[in-house]
Amino acid sequence: SQAALAVNISAARGLQDVLRTNLGPKGTMKMLVSGAGDIKLTKDGNVLLHEMQIQHPTASLIAKVATAQDDITGDGXTSNVLIIGELLKQADLYISEGLHPRII
């Protein structure tokens, strides 16, 4: 349904928004605080994706794809999340104009 599609795209875009500011040499650091109060500063997308407690199935699947990319090549976790988010953003625009999701 249209509502389910919107929720899935929104979850993917939320993950994209979290990682967007990490990309590149001027990327910002994120502070992770564990349940025990330990603090970790990082801008490594792979570390962030491993440490985040992602609940939504679509966002979790995207995180798994990105971390698999990083495990294989040693890089690219953040870029993968950003590209997937942009592809879904564009797909959402086409769908809102009446294009059927199967065509995309």
From Swiss-Prot:
It comes from the Eukaryota. ATP binds at G24, G76, T78. It is an enzyme of class 3 (hydrolase). Its EC number is 3.6.1.-. One of its GO terms (molecular function) is ATP hydrolysis activity. ADP binds at G24, G76, T78, S79. PROSITE patterns: TCP1_1, TCP1_2, TCP1_3. It is found in: Cytoplasm. Keywords: ATP-binding, Chaperone, Cytoplasm, Hydrolase, Magnesium, Metal-binding, Nucleotide-binding. Mg(2+) binds at D75. Pfam families: Cpn60_TCP1. GO terms for cellular component: chaperonin-containing T-complex. Component of the chaperonin-containing T-complex (TRiC), a hexadecamer composed of two identical back-to-back stacked rings enclosing a protein folding chamber. Each ring is made up of eight different subunits: TCP1/CCT1, CCT2, CCT3, CCT4, CCT5, CCT6A/CCT6, CCT7, CCT8. Interacts with PACRG. Belongs to the TCP-1 chaperonin family. This is T-complex protein 1 subunit zeta. The gene is CCT6.
